[in-house]
Regions:
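Short basic (Lys/Arg) and small-residue
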Residues: 194
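Short linear motifs at protein or domain termini
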Residues: 5-6, 11-14, 18-143, 150, ...
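Short loop-to-helix capping motifs
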Residues: 70, 178, 199-201, 245-246
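C-terminal all-alpha effector/ligand-binding and dimerization domain
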Residues: 165-168, 172, 189, 205-282
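A generic "binding-loop/recognition-motif" signal
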Residues: 103, 190, 199
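Short, flexible helix-adjacent loops and helix caps
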Residues: 58, 62, 149, 153-157, ...
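All-alpha effector-binding/dimerization core of bacterial HTH-type transcriptional repressors
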Residues: 112-189, 230-256
Length: 282
């Protein structure tokens, strides 16, 4: 599109009338409503571009080795070059693509992706490889959460212990009532507190991954209409054991939760192969 200053005066006026007043402002200050609006617009376009490309790459629509050009993405997504650049930078940080000078933006193989990033997890859960992703996450949680519960029993601050007990009781109420939206929020908070209460920052940094796992189960219809009563009891057992400082009981109850989770989800991955990541010879 030609720039305004090259157009005849009457056409300049017509096009100018279509531009939001904020777009004509040259100076914006912090707190200015226009600054907020424009930032929101930019963030929304950027988010849409990242989601569109990330979903297609992880879902296989854009296979390994596929090359994209920035100008084509501008046309496809109806966004500016700066939005494309920002989106590509995000995808690069996730290991999904690389930029090659005078070639373009190339899709990288799955073993180069960051499997711990919540975005990658969400996109995998939305695709055909959902079962394999659920298996990997369930096995990770099985290895970590019982240990985290045991550590929390010995290290968590009193306020966290009390909140955990309260949440476990609220989870039972929500589960019995079939209020799965509230149950999901409480379940996410429960497991986040267990990981955080361990006092291990590596465990605490898995909260995002666990959140995507629990959310994905609900979004993709992999949760029962009412949580198993035994599972609700095990959550309360974990909370009370942590509150009482009983690490062994906390670990055992958390392990029971994960064994039940695996039993419920196993049919979703029975026919999906495992992923073997190449090991570099350094």
């Amino acid at each position: 599109m030609p720039t305004l200053w090259k157009l005849p005066r009457h056409k300049q006026s017509m096009m100018s009338a279509r531009i939001h007043p904020c777009m004509r402002r040259r100076v914006l200050h912090a707190g200015d409503p226009c600054a907020t609006m424009l930032t929101s617009m930019s963030t929304s376009l950027h988010h849409r571009a990242v989601e569109h490309l990330g979903t297609r790459i992880v879902g296989g629509a854009l296979p390994t080795g596929h090359v994209m050009l920035a100008e084509h993405l501008e046309d496809e997504l109806k966004v500016s070059r700066s939005v494309v650049r920002e989106a590509v930078r995000v995808l690069q940080s996730l290991g999904l693509v690389e930029t090659i000078k005078r070639v373009g933006i190339r899709v990288l193989p799955a073993h180069r992706w960051n499997p711990f990033d919540p975005l990658v997890i969400r996109w995998r859960l939305a695709g055909e490889g959902r079962g394999a992703q659920l298996r990997s996450l369930a096995e990770l949680r099985s290895a970590v959460e019982p240990v985290a519960a045991e550590l929390a029993a010995g290290n968590a601050p009193e306020s966290l212990r009390q909140e955990l007990v309260g949440i476990s009781l609220a989870m039972k109420e929500a589960g019995d009532a079939g209020d799965m939206a509230r149950f999901l929020d409480l379940d996410i908070r429960f497991h986040a507190l267990v990981l955080s209460g361990s006092g291990n920052e590596m465990f605490a940094n898995l909260i995002g991954q666990v959140t995507e796992t629990l959310t994905g189960r609900t979004v993709h219809g992999l949760m029962p209409e009412h949580p198993q009563k035994q599972a609700l009891q095990w959550h309360m057992d974990v909370a009370h054991a942590i509150d009482a400082g009983d690490g062994s009981l906390a670990r055992d109850a958390a392990a029971k939760i994960m064994r039940q989770t695996i039993a419920e989800l196993a049919p979703s991955w029975d026919d999906q192969p495992r992923v073997f990541v190449p090991v570099s010879k350094n």
